[in-house]
Swiss-Prot record:
The gene is FAS2. It comes from Candida albicans (Yeast). It comes from the Eukaryota. PANTHER family: FATTY ACID SYNTHASE SUBUNIT BETA, MALONYL COA-ACYL CARRIER PROTEIN TRANSACYLASE. This is Fatty acid synthase subunit alpha. Acetyl-CoA binds at residues 1771-1773, 1797, 1807, 1816-1826, 1840-1843, 1870-1872. Residues 108-126 have a biased composition (Low complexity). Mg(2+) binds at residues 1771-1773, 1871-1872. GO terms for biological process: mitotic nuclear membrane biogenesis; palmitic acid biosynthetic process. The active site is at residues 1304, 1546, 1587. Its EC number is 2.3.1.86, 1.1.1.100, 2.3.1.41.
Length: 1885
């Protein structure tokens, strides 16, 4: 056959085949069955560009033939030509053919260490191992120029940022870009530059065909685009020196590739670009090895890296070089180089090595000396000592706490709500203690605060409110009494004792139990005075002494004198027995009996723990006169447990007089309290659980100013002291906490200097009154033979440096008239216990100070009071002995709790003891009689041994019994008695707001019903955010509770990518649940919190900047560039011709370029004098920011990859926040909006301060650096682009789009614009909110303005990242930047009710304001005060418009007028119809005319009602100078300025803002007459989140909504000490902890932005909106919301488990043909079609869309009535006009049948209203005389026939009147909608 005939036949065959293909159905399934089943084909090959049919064949085999093939032992192979060429042609991999070395060769070859191959940055696919190198020349491969196919494929894939195999050549560019026109334009532009010209419509042509079209004219050379991209790849990702020429030479020498194939390899490298610059040339070669292998695979060639021929090639594993020969070869070169170096040195007159050698020797000698000294020091002092003495003191880290005035109000409020919520039901000791602390902080502001809350306590709500009112009033009265008194330390705690038990299972259990015999400290003092059996001493009586004297004298006396002596002796005895002044044992007993009668503990009846004794609070301020002091009850010959000793020649001995002084002081302190006002005290050793901590509590509760030291300075420690001060700090008290190591001499000196230095020098300027140095460390286990480094260090702390401390204070004391009292911590342990190192020696040595006080010169500046501290349970030193304390007390001595010992020591600070200390040193024995126990060590050892022995026996018996029971009764015998822990399961609810019952709603605001126009009320129906704490739910958990719940932890773990949901086979078994994202191992949901919480907290919130989140930005190495001038010619480098010419263009004569002939590349040499920009790095001091949680990924939510790669990161935050906000509104499909509103009525008013900063960075910085940047980067930088993406991917609306830019106030400004957009009628649904990102550029510029927190300084001050944002505190120092987005869905209340979406809050008011003239853009201003603008003048009475009853009366009058107008208009329609008939002639349709006109009348009536409600409800206050916008907005909901419960502050933590904002809110409240004593809660969210700029107001608004929903007010947990300057703002409370209230009615949100932007929004609880509704409307709404909640709940769970929360729309809800018709019909609505909401032809310009059902029914009735001219009645009633809850009204006007019918309808309110309207219409149709407006209409009954049609039945008077008027029958028509009911009646005569 001739070729031309063959070609013609082939053409015909192809045409026919194609025709058949297009015209016939595809029967591929049948075809597969033929070759798979009939022919049992085992090898199937697809010839085509991609494995399309092969994939289908694989699926078919798996689904249908798997078992079939197994039965027949068929092993099928499905291949595709495009990817399986080697398998098809049976070509082995070249690597498999590489020669393998034999073991013998390996042994004979000298082994060398294997060099670790550096791994290059990850490319798109795994890099295959290169073929082993060969010594011979590589076999060259026939060259082939680049094909257009590959070039186009690479250029498109590179632009799409996808690997080649992800870009099918069968698709057109238009399909590949997925609708992104800018990317499409970029690709076409690149192709144009590459090929010179493009065919027509290349975007619609598949890449295969496009390549064929280009191939005809393609030269095979790389063009401009590809050359530029390759050049950029080499310069940005290859190591220095590895140029294009190097790469080409390597490819040629390594694989024998020619220039064309080299081009192809370089092209393929573009789609496998490394993530980072490769580190070395070896890495680069490895990279190109992999690319070359890929190219070879795609090109169908084999690569070999060794010689293709030659006998030696196969066996050559690499040449072996003789090392000796190599050394000889290089020796001469090294020698020459050395000689040259020496010549140069001589020329420079510099001797090599001499200087460095001398210095080296000196350094070595010095180093040896130093090392010797260090070794000696280490050997002598030990490692522990060396580390222990390191100084830690820093004045910068000091914490000052003095804001008692704020904590007092916080505590009062907490107590108030504790009573209300039943947490506090009786007055116990703790409550009394709280009351004392509150009284200690009483001031006029606090009293007003308490009085307001007690006066407004709603007792009708229950018993707890009554209790709160009663107790609260008592506390107020107490506070008034002590207002002028000094604060006192008064401990009312229960006295406890030790109790040790051994359980049946052998467990030793210790607890502190209340003592029944001693209930309060007054009785405790009495007990201490009595002493015990062990403290009794046998002392001779006076009589016995006289007898001994008499006997001694009488022996030496004469008989006469003996008689005289006997008479004198007898007289003396009589005097002793009769004298009341001489103490005897009997007299002591008598006194004791008298004293114990009224105070016997068993007879005490006024124990404040009893519930009935709440009057204990009332008696707290009373001062008790002590008639009989406790000292008078000290028994004879008994030493009290607590006593004072006096120094005698025999040592220290008990002194009764001094002890009485001390005990009486203790008694007074217990009964009346002890004040420390104006006392300055230093306390060391006051850690948690120590005696010092209890002493510290007492000092600050008594009003002292205390500086306390801590050796373990941390956030946890400072929080401990802050909490202590917040609870116990009294008026005038101050607590200062500093880090301090008492083992460091430097710290001792620095501490004292800090205390005494003047404030201007950075000190306190104090003069100490007392020093309580209790610092110590335990030395347990150190005996005489083990006095180690720790013992020596402990000795230094407890003795050496304690003395230094006293000495330093002495040297700083300014005068001799104010000595500081030092309470020395002595111990009875003088080696008694043993094995405690140098503890005893340290304590004994302190006693030398009693003598030195006399012998040295510091007695006038320091006084000494030794306190021998007894056995104190629970301290760090003694806690191990707790279990034997009970046994010790049974010996007749006393052990003490920490509170008791602190009380004892504080008793040494009474004025009497202080005075005594100034006269002489005082020794206070607080040992509890322990010193009277001989062999204490033996007793303690025996007690411990007995306990352990008992425990062992019981344990053994328990185990034996258990074994016996199991043998007898089986292993499960204990099952019923075993303790089972019920572990909680996660329950992720995604709840909507809880709806109250209608009756509860009506109680809130009964007058509100029907008062507001709901189309002019804007509500928040959805809200969400993306921020440092995840989303709004997880942020609220952290803000409100300070920790994540189990559900919150799961959600955060999911957000951060720690876990994912798995549903399918796992490890060979079906599994449905959470798995660890890294290991793919299952994890139980209850374990998620414990496993991931630490990591979650570490990588969320405010934290150190994580470079991986910000493209590698590390503030510690912030990169900048600096211009330098080149001082000498630089080394040449290689680049492309285009780049070389650009260098030449820039540098001119200072740049040389030359072409490299081999490669066509150019070398460039920068010459002297050229200017270059050289990067440098500085240490930036803003290291901390609020960052999105690490691991946050838009893919987790379902956002497509192409969108992620296209948009700015902030757009992703906005998309996620938007979809979550919609879900929060119950909207699972945004197109649902269009069922209720037109596409033009959904708008977007969200905005940003900066917009896409990542895009801006790319546009300016990266583009300037010539880094790869997408060509459409500009569009992503626009602030409105984020809103555009929301519309393009989710909404497809055509409504208003407004983009506010208000810096930090953007979000609230957005809400303001959104509300205006809705109220102006331009939209009914609007997305509002704000968003901003964090980037280094903004961070740097904020720092330049000194606006942000300096992290370096904060670290110096001991702050952790999470506490660096501290609004309102004394130490606040700049805001903390953050990033994220916040979105709210707002709409009209009317629409929200119709849709049944949740209403989270009502937006009662928004406003923005500028400030005054100035020159500072960021300066804070008070312009927003204008929301409280209101003229007062000398006006005395409020405007009546503020009275809702007045407004309601006016509204009702107006509604009556509208009703009358509507009825009149409807009755005139007949006349209008007659006139219209004449006008339109034959074309006139009576029915159509009446229908349209009726609808117009209805719409006009509705508009008038709306205007009336706006006038008297929504907008009555506007433009009224007497009513402030803020007051008016609240009054619209029947609220007052007192009802704003919370003010959410902008609170940036800057010095200026927090003061300015507090002043603004305070003045706002004051001007509007807020009640005194009623401050708003101040919420300062930014302590937790940082400041996200544009998103700030959105997050605050979300928090405000959550406050309304929960009633919980979150505290500012970083408010460790509120600034004293803020105390003046009495209308603001600054809580530091969350407070659960009984409900918040309204919340104010204020926001301030740079550029004179002030903004405020007020949200009101939705209950006040629901109060506007009637019962049926509310209950119908509740039903809708419940159904929507269930649907959303299901959707959210599916979204999280399937990662499908975000589902991008791919089509608008209308076809292209319907786009414009939809825009042009405002009544067009979507319908559900195949489970999708879409517009259709029938919904556009529909005849049914304008005229409503009511109008049609009414028109029909009117057209019927047109035949008669009399007996017509028309009545119109608003649904809200009929009160169906009024039983009297129903009984008087409706029959039983009517009531039953109406109540059983779907809408009872409408049914009753329609029936009433029908009665009125019938009455009018009868034409009889009215009996007045109040006449009953029960005689007119409206019934329904079998078809439901209304019928009229007349009874009684109505029937008589009808008969009299000649009416035979009355026809009635009723219709209603959700607004009104209309009835038309016609009488038949």
């Amino acid at each position: 056959m001739k070729p031309e005939i063959e070609q013609e036949l082939s053409h015909t065959l192809l045409t026919e085949l194609l025709a058949y293909q297009f015209a016939s159905p595809v029967r591929w399934i049948e075809t597969q069955d033929v070759f798979l089943k009939q022919h049992n084909t085992e090898r199937i090959i697809e010839i085509g560009p991609s494995p399309t049919l092969a994939g289908m064949a694989n699926r078919t085999i798996k689904a249908k033939y798997e078992s079939y093939d197994a039965a027949l032992s068929l092993q099928r192979q499905v291949l595709c030509y495009s990817k399986d060429a080697k398998e098809i042609y049976y070509k082995p991999d070249p690597a498999d053919l590489a020669p393998k070395e034999t073991p013998k060769q390996e042994e004979s070859t000298p082994s060398a260490p294997a060099a670790a191959t550096p791994t290059p940055a990850a490319a798109a696919a795994p890099t295959p191992a290169p073929a082993p190198a060969s010594a011979g020349p590589v076999e060259s491969i026939p060259d082939e120029p680049v094909k257009a196919n590959l070039l186009i494929h690479v250029l498109v894939a590179q632009k799409l940022k996808k690997p080649l195999d992800a870009v099918p050549m069968t698709k057109a560019i238009k399909d590949l870009v997925n609708g992104k026109s800018t990317v499409q334009n970029e690709i076409l532009g690149d192709l144009g530059k590459e090929f010179g010209s493009t065919p027509e419509k290349p975007e619609d042509t598949p890449l295969e065909e496009l390549a064929e079209q280009f191939q005809d004219s393609f030269s095979g050379q790389l063009g401009k685009t590809s050359t530029s991209l390759i050049g950029r790849l080499m310069s940005s990702k290859m190591p220095g020196g590895f140029s294009i020429t190097t790469a080409r030479k390597y490819l040629e020498s390594r694989f024998g590739l020619g220039a064309g194939r080299q081009d192809s390899v370089l092209l393929m490298a573009l789609t496998n670009e490394p993530a980072n610059r490769l580190g070395s040339e070896a890495d680069a070669k490895t990279f190109f090895d992999g690319i070359a292998q890929k190219y070879a695979s795609s090109a169908g060639i084999s690569l070999s890296s060794g010689a293709g021929s030659g006998a030696g090639a196969a066996n050559s594993g690499g040449a072996v070089v003789d090392s000796a020969a190599l050394d000889a070869l290089t020796a001469e070169n090294k020698k020459l180089a050395k000689q040259q170096l020496e010549v140069l040195a001589r020329y420079l007159q510099s001797r090599l090595k001499q200087g460095s050698l001398k210095s080296f020797i000196k350094e070595k000698e010095a180093s040896a000396v130093l090392q010797k000294e260090l070794d000696l020091w280490e050997a002598e002092h030990g490692e522990f000592y060396a580390k222990g003495i390191q100084p830690t003191f820093s004045a910068l880290k000091s914490r000052t706490y003095d804001s008692y005035w704020n904590w007092a109000r916080q505590d009062v409020l907490s107590m108030y709500f504790d009573i209300i919520f039943g947490k506090l039901t009786s007055v116990d000791r703790e409550t009394i203690n709280q009351c004392i602390q509150i009284m200690n902080r009483a001031n006029p502001t606090l009293i007003k605060f308490m009085q307001y809350h007690i006066d407004h306590c709603p007792e009708y709500k229950g018993e707890t409110y009554k209790l709160a009112k009663r107790l609260g009033q008592q506390l107020i009265d107490n506070c008034k009494q002590v207002l002028t008194e000094d604060p006192v330390y008064k401990d009312v705690s229960r006295i406890t004792g030790p109790k040790t038990k051994v359980s049946a299972k052998g467990n030793i259990e210790y607890e502190e139990t209340q003592k029944d015999s001693v209930r309060k400290f007054e009785q405790y003092v009495y007990e201490m005075a009595q002493g015990g059996a062990m403290t009794k001493v046998s002392q001779p009586t006076i009589q016995e002494d006289l007898a001994r004297v008499y006997k001694a004298i009488s022996k030496q006396a004469s008989k006469d004198s003996k008689l005289e002596l006997q008479r004198v002796y007898e007289d003396l005895l009589k005097v002793v027995e009769s004298s009341k002044e001489i103490e005897t044992e009997q007299l002591t007993k008598d006194i004791l009996q008298a004293a114990t009668v009224p105070t016997t503990p068993t007879e005490e009846v006024d124990d404040p723990c009893t519930p009935s004794s709440d009057d204990e609070i009332a008696s707290l301020p009373d001062k008790t006169s002590i008639i009989q002091p406790v000292s008078s009850t000290i028994p004879s010959q008994t030493i009290p447990f607590l006593h004072i000793q006096k120094k005698t020649k025999d040592g220290w001995e008990y002194n009764k007089k001094l002890s009485s002084l001390y005990l009486d002081g203790l008694e007074s302190a217990a009964i009346n309290g002890l004040t420390f006002k104006d006392k300055y005290v230093l306390v060391t050793g006051a850690g948690a659980g120590s005696i010092g901590a209890e002493i510290l509590q007492g000092l600050i509760s008594g009003g002292a100013k205390v500086i306390v030291t801590t050796s373990r300075f941390s956030k946890k420690v400072t929080e401990y002291y802050q909490n202590m001060y917040a609870r116990y700090g009294a008026a005038g008290s101050t607590l200062i906490v500093v880090p301090f190591n008492q083992g460091s001499k430097q710290d001792v000196d620095a501490l004292v200097q800090y205390i005494y230095d003047e404030p201007k020098k950075g000190g306190l300027g104090w003069d100490l009154d007392a020093i309580i140095p209790f610092a110590a460390i335990p030395e347990n286990g150190n005996g005489l033979d083990n006095i180690d480094s720790k013992s020596e260090f402990a000795h230094r702390i407890m003795l050496t440096n304690l003395l230094r401390l006293l000495g330093a204070v002495k040297s700083k004391k300014p005068t001799d008239t104010r000595p500081a009292q030092c309470i020395l911590p002595l111990s009875p342990n003088h080696g008694t216990f043993g094995f405690d190192g140098l503890y005893s020696e340290s304590k004994i040595s302190l006693e030398t100070l009693f003598n030195r006080w006399y012998s040295e010169d510091w007695g006038s500046k320091l006084t000494v009071c030794g306190a021998v501290i007894g056995w104190t349970r629970g301290t760090g030193l003694m806690s191990a002995n707790n279990i034997i304390a009970e046994g010790i007390e049974k010996l007749g001595v006393r052990t003490f709790s920490q509170k008791e010992m602190a009380f004892n020591i504080l008793g040494l600070l009474t004025p009497e003891i202080v005075q005594l200390c100034q006269e002489e040193p005082v020794m206070a024995d607080l040992n509890g009689g322990l010193q009277f126990i001989d062999n204490l060590k033996d007793f303690t050892s025996k007690l411990r041994t007995d306990l352990l022995e008992t425990a062992d026996i019981r344990r053994a018996v328990s185990i034996e019994s258990a074994i016996e029971q199991k043998v007898v009764n089986g292993d499960n015998v204990d099952a019923n008695y075993s303790k089972v822990m019920v572990e909680p399961r996660a329950n992720m609810k995604f709840d909507f707001p809880t709806l109250k019952s209608y009756d509860e709603i009506k109680q809130i605001a009964p007058e509100l019903e029907g008062m507001l126009d709901l189309e002019n009320v804007v509500v928040v129906t959805g809200f969400a955010e993306v921020g440092p704490w995840g989303n709004s739910r997880t942020r609220w958990e952290m803000e409100a509770y300070g920790e994540f719940s189990l559900e919150g932890a799961i959600e955060m773990a999911w957000i951060m990518g720690f876990i994912k949901y798995h549903n399918g086979n796992l490890q060979g078994k079906p599994y449905s649940g959470w798995v660890d994202a890294k290991t793919q191992t299952p994890i139980d949901e209850k374990d998620i919190k414990s496993k991931y919480e630490e990591e979650i907290l570490e990588h969320s919130g405010i934290r150190l900047i994580e470079p991986e989140l910000f493209n590698g930005y590390d503030p510690k190495k912030k990169q900048m560039i600096q211009e330098i001038v080149v001082q000498h010619d630089l080394e040449p480098f290689e680049c492309s011709k285009e780049t070389a010419e650009q260098y030449k263009h820039e540098h001119g004569e200072k740049c040389e370029i030359f072409e490299i002939e081999e490669s066509g590349e150019y070398t460039v040499r920068i010459l002297k004098g050229a200017t270059l920009y050289v990067p440098k790095a500085l240490r930036f001091d803003r290291l901390v920011a609020g960052q999105i949680p690490t691991g946050w990924d838009a893919r987790t939510y379902g956002i497509p990859e192409d969108t992620i790669s296209q948009v700015d990161p902030i757009t992703l935050y906005v998309l996620v926040a938007t979809v979550e906000a919609l879900l929060s509104a119950g909207i699972t499909d945004p197109y649902e909006f269009y069922k209720y509103v037109h596409v033009s009525e959904v708008g977007n008013c969200s905005g940003s301060g900066m917009g896409g900063v990542s895009a801006l960075r790319g546009m300016f910085k990266d583009r300037y650096a010539d880094k790869p940047v997408q060509n459409d980067i500009l569009q992503e930088s626009f602030i409105n682009t984020m809103s555009a993406w929301v519309n393009m991917l989710l909404l497809s609306s055509s409504g208003p789009i407004k983009t506010p830019v208000g810096a930090c106030a953007t979000a609230v400004e957005s809400v303001d614009i959104g509300i205006e957009t809705i109220l102006s009628g331009k939209a009914k649904v609007v997305l509002v909110g704000g968003y901003d990102d964090f980037q280094e550029e903004g961070s740097y510029e904020f720092a330049n303005m000194n606006a942000t927190s300096n992290s370096i300084e904060e670290f110096k001050h001991g702050r952790t990242p999470k506490e660096m944002s501290r609004p309102t505190t004394t130490t606040r120092n700049g805001f903390m930047e953050a990033q994220g987005s916040g979105i709210q869905v707002i709409m009209t209340a009317d629409l929200a009710l119709k849709m049944g979406v949740p209403i989270h809050a009502v937006l009662a008011m928004t406003a923005t304001a500028t400030d005054k003239i100035g020159r500072s853009v960021p300066a804070p201003g008070k312009g927003i005060l204008t929301t409280a603008r209101e003229h007062h003048g000398n006006l005395k009475y409020p405007s009546p418009l503020l009275n809702i009853k007045y407004r309601k009366r006016q509204l009702n009058k107006r509604l009556e007028q509208i009703k009358s107008w509507e009825e009149t208009e409807l009755s005139y329609l007949q006349e209008e119809a007659e006139l219209a008939k004449e006008e339109f002639g034959d074309e006139f349709s009576m029915h159509e005319f009446l229908k349209e006109r009726t609808e117009e009348v209805y719409r006009e009536s509705k508009r008038q009602v709306s205007d009336a409600k706006k006038q008297w409800g929504n907008s009555f206050y506007k433009s009224d100078p007497r009513i402030a916008p803020l007051r008016g907005a609240l009054a619209a909901f029947n609220l007052t300025i007192d009802d704003i419960g919370v003010a959410s502050f902008h609170g940036t933590s800057t010095v200026a803002n927090d003061k300015n904002e507090s002043a603004t809110i305070n003045n706002m409240m004051k001007h509007l007459g807020r009640s005194e004593g009623n401050p708003v809660f101040g919420v300062f969210q930014k302590y937790l989140t940082g400041h996200p700029k544009g998103a700030a107001g959105a997050w605050m608004l979300n928090g405000a909504i959550q406050i309304l929903e929960s009633g919980l007010v979150p505290g500012n947990r970083n408010a460790d000490n509120v600034d004293k300057l803020l105390e003046q703002y009495e209308y603001v409370l600054y809580p530091s902890r969350s407070i659960q209230t009984d409900g918040i009615k309204a919340v104010s949100v204020t926001s301030f932005g740079f550029g004179q932007k002030g903004a405020q929004a007020v949200v009101v609880h939705p209950d006040y909106l629901f109060a506007v509704l009637d019962r049926s409307t509310y209950e119908e709404y509740a039903t809708k919301v419940s159904a929507r909640n269930k649907k959303t709940y299901r959707y959210m769970h599916n979204a999280i488990t399937r990662n499908t929360m975000f589902v991008a729309k791919d089509k608008a809800p209308y076809s292209d043909e319907l786009e414009q018709p939809v825009y042009l019909d405002p009544l067009a609505r979507v319908e559900e079609n195949k489970k999708k909401l879409v517009f259709s032809d029938k919904t556009i310009q529909s005849n049914q869309s304008y005229v409503g059902e009511v109008a049609q029914k009414t028109a029909k009735a009117l057209s019927t009535l047109n035949k008669s001219s009399k007996g017509v009645g028309v009545d119109v009633e608003l649904l809200s006009a009929i009160n169906i809850d009024n039983e009297t009204f129903i009984e008087r006007n409706f029959t039983g049948n009517e009531v039953e019918y109406c109540l059983n309808t779907a809408h009872p309110q409408a049914s009753f209203t329609g029936t009433w309207s029908a009665k009125e219409a019938v009455f009018k149709a009868l034409g009889v005389e009215s009996k007045g407006a109040g006449a009953s209409l029960i005689d007119i009954e409206i019934t329904r026939d079998v078809n439901g049609a209304p019928k009229v039945i007349l009874h009684g008077e109505a029937k008589k009147a009808a008969a009299k008027a000649g009416v035979k029958n009355v026809n009635i028509s009723i219709s209603h909608d959700d607004f009104q009911a209309t009835a038309v009646a016609l009488s038949e005569f």
